[in-house]
């Protein structure tokens, strides 16, 4: 009688999930890779649909060789039966049982067919999602997220518009602006509310200065990549507007122009600096936040916005690991390092052995360097202190329930709301289809509340029929 091999469920097929799946399956663990997309890769390695006949998909990507290695490795493990890849499976709950875990998902674009995966351990590689701070006109057709514009280009080979302004804050704006320009869009301007020069500006504390210089010097490749983006912006004649912000979008039936203005040190528009830019598309984003819905449901402790993990990428819930953007925003290379460590640790512990950290020492060193680098990046792209003060009362902050900033302020000032949950109960902000994923950062900013995750048993909307039905059969690997 053959010995039963342990099963590891990896949720998310982006860089972290792929790295974890490959590392674990190479060490004798049966892996079930569950992902909502039709193809693996996540947002970073998003590929055009096969039917589009892309001739040079590598032109839309950095680190193409790494992607080819991951793609081919996954295909080999799937063919060998070591990995079961469940694509287009939308996970809505991970349930703890005495013998392990059950991953509940909905299959397909309709998200109505239930499926379940039983596993001995779970790796949460759920990635991150984009945040957008509300401003007047941001609900107009033609205003999209920066990540959405990039997804259209990478996955659909489609430009969101002909004349584009890219605005907001964060490193993501650089590849979005350069990618759109290279694909043929007229990118009028890249409007960055932060001052990236703070990356090299000397902090008041000498120790912070030394630490920052070391973190930057340890990543020459990242600095060279940024320089390459700047060169592309110059080549495509994209106007770069630093310490400025999109303060209002204009149009009748759809976007026609956007007003940008310079910001003072606290993030307020400087009077007399506003200018109007004609465009049919505004791609806007204000950084990323970790996806922690499933971790919250499992009871995993958070560290700031991300899932807290130890040196092995273990959470404080036994049998659960987390890797990639779910633990904090840090890019694809950091996700790969964390995923590799999580996969190796999970494989050892599910086999009942103690992991040897020396086996993943190179990945751990890379992880440490990249975490230090992105700590400096986070400092440079910190949100302006007073951005919410200029959100007008008439501005919709919760799209699903059409709640305005004025209603949120009334809940705080007149009704005594002091946290997001109370604001939600009084205004319905966050009660819609997105369950606050899109609006919570904006509502929190307008309300002056901390952005605290709301623990929910379900990570996404689920039909009542699915909840009432008998448990579905196990969709994991055969014994």
Q: Which role does the model predict for each range below?
A:
Residues 4-6, 111-121, 270-280, 316:
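Core beta-strand elements of the Rossmann-like FAD/NAD(P) dinucleotide-binding domain
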Residues 69, 74-105, 183-286, 290-291:
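A Rossmann-like FAD-binding core segment of flavoenzymes
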Residues 2-16, 162-170:
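Beta1/beta-strand and adjacent pyrophosphate-binding region of the FAD-binding site
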Residues 128-165, 170-176, 304-312:
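Glycine-rich dinucleotide-binding loop and its adjacent helix/turn
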Residues 11, 34, 116-127, 278-286:
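Short hydrophobic core segments
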Residues 145-153, 265, 269, 281-330:
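FAD-site-proximal beta/loop scaffold in flavoenzymes
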Residues 323-354, 358-362:
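A conserved FAD-binding loop/helix module that cradles the flavin
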Residues 6-69, 177-220:
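Beta1-alpha1 glycine-rich phosphate/pyrophosphate-binding loop at the start
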């Amino acid at each position: 009688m053959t010995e039963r091999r342990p099963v590891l469920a990896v949720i998310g097929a982006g860089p972290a999930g792929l790295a974890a799946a490959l590392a674990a399956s190479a060490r004798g663990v049966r892996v079930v890779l569950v992902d909502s997309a039709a193809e693996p890769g996540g947002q970073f390695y998003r590929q055009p649909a096969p039917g589009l006949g892309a001739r040079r998909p590598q032109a839309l990507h950095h680190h193409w060789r790494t992607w080819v290695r991951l793609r081919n490795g996954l295909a080999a493990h799937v063919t060998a039966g070591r990995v079961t890849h469940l694509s287009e499976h939308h996970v809505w709950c991970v349930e703890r049982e005495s013998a392990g875990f059950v991953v509940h998902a909905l299959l397909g674009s309709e998200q109505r067919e239930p499926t379940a995966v039983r596993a001995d351990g779970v790796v949460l590689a759920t990635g991150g999602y984009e945040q957008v701070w509300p401003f007047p006109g941001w609900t107009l057709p033609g205003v999209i997220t920066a990540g959405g514009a990039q997804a259209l280009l990478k996955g659909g080979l489609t430009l969101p518009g002909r004349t584009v302004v890219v605005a907001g804050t964060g490193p993501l704006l650089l590849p979005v602006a350069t990618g759109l320009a290279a694909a043929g869009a007229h990118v009028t301007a890249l409007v960055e509310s932060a001052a990236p020069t703070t990356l090299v500006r000397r902090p008041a504390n000498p120790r912070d200065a030394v630490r920052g210089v070391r973190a930057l010097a340890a990543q020459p490749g990242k600095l060279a990549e940024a320089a390459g983006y700047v060169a592309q912006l110059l080549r495509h004649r994209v106007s770069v507007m630093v310490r400025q912000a999109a303060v209002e979008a204009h149009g009748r039936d759809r976007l026609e122009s956007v007003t940008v203005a310079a910001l003072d040190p606290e993030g307020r528009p400087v009077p007399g600096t506003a200018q109007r830019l004609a465009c049919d598309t505004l791609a806007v984003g204000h950084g990323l936040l970790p996806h922690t819905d499933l971790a919250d449901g499992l009871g995993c402790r958070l560290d700031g916005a991300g899932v807290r993990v130890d040196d092995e990428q273990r959470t404080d819930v036994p049998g659960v690991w987390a890797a990639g953007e779910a633990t904090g925003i840090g890019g694809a290379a950091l996700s790969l390092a964390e995923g590799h460590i999580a996969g190796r640790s999970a494989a050892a512990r599910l086999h009942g052995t103690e992991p040897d950290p020396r086996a993943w020492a190179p990945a751990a060193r890379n992880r440490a360097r990249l975490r230090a680098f992105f700590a400096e990046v986070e400092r440079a792209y910190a949100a302006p202190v007073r951005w919410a003060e200029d959100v007008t009362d008439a501005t919709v902050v919760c799209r699903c329930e059409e709640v305005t900033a004025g209603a949120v302020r009334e809940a705080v000032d007149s009704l005594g709301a002091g946290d997001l949950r109370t604001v939600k109960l009084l205004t319905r902000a966050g009660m819609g289809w997105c369950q606050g994923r899109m609006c919570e950062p904006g509502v929190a900013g307008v309300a002056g509340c901390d952005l605290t995750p709301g623990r929910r048993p379900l990570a996404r909307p689920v039909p009542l029929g699915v909840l009432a039905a008998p448990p579905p059969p196990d969709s994991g690997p055969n014994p």
